[in-house]
Amino acid sequence: MKWVKSGVGILGILLTICHAVTSQGHILDITDSLKITFKTLSNFGPRAQSIQNVTIENVGIKDIPDSGWRCYFCHDQLLFPGTFNLARNQYFLRPILDNYVVLSDGFLLEFIKGCMYRITPIPRNAPIKTRDKREFTLLAEQFSVSKYDSFPKWYCETISGGNTEVGIIRNTENLKYVEDFDSSYNWFRIPHDFRSVPLQPQDRFSANHKASSVDECKYKVIPTPVKASVSKVQRNFGTTVYYGTTDTSIRGREKLFKVAEQLALKHNLGLVEITPGLTVNNGISLVVTGNYVERNIPSPDEAYSLTVTADLISIEAPALPGLINGIETIHSLSAWDMALPYGGIKDFPRFPFRGIFLDIASNFPGYNYIKKFLTVMAQYKLNKLVLPMYNNEGFRLQLNDSPRYEFQALHMIGGKRCHDLKEEKCLFSQLGSGPDSSGGYLTKAQMTDLIKTADLLNIEIIMSMNIGESARGAIVPLKQSPHSRLLYDPDDTDFVDRFYPQKDTSMNPCREETTYFYDHMLKQLKDIYNAASVPLKTIMIGSKVNFDQVLNSKYCYASNLNSTQRLMARGNLERNINGFKLNFTKRLVKTAHDNGIKEVMAIDDVFTTEFDAEGNTPNTVYDTKNSDNSTRFNATVTAVHSRYDTVRDERLWKRGDRFAELGYKVILSPPILDFNYAVEPDPDRPGDYDSVIRNISFSKLFRFVPDSRCCNIPNAIQHDCALESDCTTAGAKDSYIGTLGKLDTRKLRSLKDWNELLFPRLLIFAERSWHKSSWEDSFGPHRASVNNITRQLITNYTVPNWNDINNEESKVLGCISRKEKLRLMHEDGLKPYVEPPGARLLGGNTMRIAASTTEDSFWVQASVNGNPWTDNVKILDVNPTDSVRLRTVHPAKAELRSKEVKLNLTSLPTPRERFRKIAQDALSRRIGIDIQRARMPPMPVNPAYRPPVPLPSFDPADDRAPDLAAIAAAHPPPLPPGMPSHMMPNMPPPFPPRPPFGPPMLPPGQMRALGQQAGQALRGQGTALGPQTGQQPMPAQPRGPLTGQAAGTGVAGQTGQQPSTAGQGTQQGLPGQQRGGVLPGQWPFFPGMPAAQFPPMFNPQMQRALQMRGQGQIPQRTQGAAAGAGQSRIPQQAG
């Protein structure tokens, strides 16, 4: 199927006029005069999750003509998602015209490619006069709760005589054109979503914060050593670095010399090799002993011992990696005052693999940043850096493919983005890159230098390739190369990814060109590694095959088949799709092995099956042994376990142990290690989110427990741990070799944003990956039992050792603030995230403010009415009419500061406190209902009967212990089928406070343009959003299970859309991730929470619908009738 544009009749003539644009003014007259304002009105709109308003204003001195120009912008979510054909995987914007949406105020909207859309003024409308405004509304697929969901650099073009001029609309250079998120309409992802409400200073205030002292942090090493004993007596570095080794190889001795030389140069010391009879004193002794005292540890090569006495600073290790770790420890000990304390340290890591996946493909940070990042990784003893060569947004490595230069176009075209619709010179603009050439790539010389640098820091650089989906950065450039073998066939069926709607994003595994490309890339990488004198040991496969493409590609079948034979062959292939997938995976591993690569890493989806008729599921893992017990893969295979969601009741967090049982090495990479998640729910700060995880705080990351495979599961029953029946622990512990943190950079346009999300969370990740704390064993699965008398299900919650957790967390995070953030700024030039201050009003006759900060050694500064900042504020007198702004700042580094926050001088609860109270009320009502039901006799035939939930003691706002009922309050479930009316509590539903203004309303003209009609607000239809205009009452749901449908939200036209669950982030090609999105008719799954087992009181609209049905106000209809009213039947889809 091809993309279709109407070319007949009046509509075709209109489009022809629109595209035959001629310049009626210089581009700057348009881009300097236009002002764009973007506002998310509500995340609860009809037919889509988000209603967004765009205002175009002429702020110039000239009128803007009604034609001759058009503008481009990036929107990462599908606009008008009703035009996406899920069954055929096609995306047409055609409510009125093929491939177009007619917007209000005289504009056409069309989809271009990737995230790019184009708006064109309809000719013969009035020009946009000075100070005139035009507005139109967009319907987006998902909710939007952050300014970083929008992209900068909207730009326009004019065409005159074949010459194109382009320019960026000036006020969209940054995100200031996006208006504030200021109410529950655009804070909430779903009703009662109080965790998404931005924090106010009152929410952050901590009256009893225990600050760490200088003495506690001065010699604190992060990550924490296994054994350490130091005193307050100090000494300097001495005069000489002595080095020696038992390694007789030339490479081993040369590498030790370079390591010792770097240490000597850094501290301006002499350098002497240890020889027999040499007296070693007054300096630093570095000795590789070759003596493995402890072999029963995870990574004996990285063990070391450090001894500091009056005579000598001695570091001994069995191998050079351990010696390098010891050197980083003396750097940490001496960071405060360039002196070392007397004492000793014995240390080794808990995992041999401690890595970071740094997405340099989506947005390229530059060679210098990557080199600096290697230095920071070494400081905190991280030893693996995974770099993607390419994804959909770019190709980032120059290859040495002379003399044919077969793949030269990869970096020349794929390494930059610009306004080139034909993509002959660059990839088309994406992700707010604008019309001018932007991006970059690593040259061969730069890549060689990075590999050398990393090797001296005990870091292995692992390159990741997407041999399957998310490969557009490699596919498109090769179309323009006269010598290359194309990875793209224009005759392929037009099946596209609904989260990246264009078809040339996946390599076809049935074509020999794909295997040739993969083999050539491996050879090129091997040449680069050889130039650095470092062996290429590991490669990573970063995406899986697109099976829609496989089933519809002519290359996957014999060429001489007629239509009937082709249909039969397709059925056979579909039944044997997992055999096809296994053979392709084996071919990838064998090709790597043939190129001398000993280990192949891959996302977990590569080594698991798809659903099929034989009962295979995504939890079915390919065995590393064949049926005759021979080895299936001829290289070491390592699975990156990153999927922790649920697909058709398959708990994918169980995969890890299945991998371990069947002979894989396993790397843990759960969603809690995704650094692209926001630090806190702040719409103004960078960071992503999904339907389950709004943010990953420092505390939450600190409580990551790698050894507990039943925990680290987003929104599990309590403290992210599941029921024992929902997890397995049979996998061999030794098979778990490490952890992998990830940074997806799709929405991060500046290095400032990168640093804010990475630091200091990278340090906390390093702490958990290197050091195992004693309290970690207190985490574990919850156990369920049945009361033999009442037959009620009882859950016995495992309670972690919160006292020890809080004490250690306070020390580690306190020393990160007091010491490590200064190191990042002073030694590395990186500005980490600084938490804003807290404050509250004190009681009494005068208005006084108490301020606090959790950042040890930092000050709180205050500015009243715009006056200069006051330092170190703890108590401040103010007047009721004052405007007070606060920020956290380091007294020695003024640039190390937080964002400014405004304090509302009111004693009323903050929005977060109000919404928390709503959830608490919901919990109380839920508990009350369950207590009543507990007194009733068991009624197994009654589908509405449920056993009570125990009463755990917790704070619903505390992310360490999310409770079943609090989660239910935040995520309203569908209507339980067949709920008897006498079981419904006669009580009002727990509404959130209504915003101070009415719900966003579409003008009738806009509603007609969108194919909608203004309806009547029905009595009893009020919700957290207020009465919704344009909505009709929802027909009653039939008894029995629904087919692939979540309950509607009380309005016609709602398709029950919710985004995917945690672990499905926003970047294809990252370990185990797919772009998070909406599947119509689905609700996100939460472990241990069958949706039909919650009372509809948690869904106000369901409660109202039931009451109205009981009063005869809503007639009961069949499923077919409901579909006719706007609720189309949609097959069940994987989450």
From Swiss-Prot:
This protein's UniProt keywords: Hydrolase, Secreted, Signal
Tissue spec: Prismatic layer of shell (at protein level). Expressed primarily in the mantle with highest level in the mantle edge and lower level in the mantle pallium.
Enzyme Commission numbers on file: 3.2.1.52
Bias-annotated ranges (Low complexity): 1004-1026, 1043-1073
Pfam families attached to this UniProt entry: CHB_HEX, Glyco_hydro_20
Gene3D superfamilies: 2.60.40.290, Chitobiase/beta-hexosaminidase domain 2-like, Glycosidases
Domain of life of the source: Eukaryota
MF (Gene Ontology): beta-N-acetylhexosaminidase activity; polysaccharide binding
Residue ranges, compositional bias (Pro residues): 986-1003
SMART domains: CHB_HEX (SM01081)
Subcellular location: Secreted
Keyword Hydrolase: yes
Residues spanning the signal sequence: 1-23
Pathway(s) served: Glycan degradation; chitin degradation
Gene Ontology, cellular component aspect: extracellular region; membrane
Main location: secreted
SUPFAM superfamilies: (Trans)glycosidases, beta-N-acetylhexosaminidase-like domain, Carbohydrate-binding domain
Catalytic activity as recorded in UniProt: Hydrolysis of terminal non-reducing N-acetyl-D-hexosamine residues in N-acetyl-beta-D-hexosaminides
Region annotated Disordered, chain positions: 970-1082, 1107-1135
Example GO biological process: chitin catabolic process
Family indicated by similarity: Belongs to the glycosyl hydrolase 20 family.
Protein name (database record): Putative beta-hexosaminidase
Native species: Margaritifera margaritifera
Classification of source organism: Eukaryota, Metazoa, Spiralia, Lophotrochozoa, Mollusca
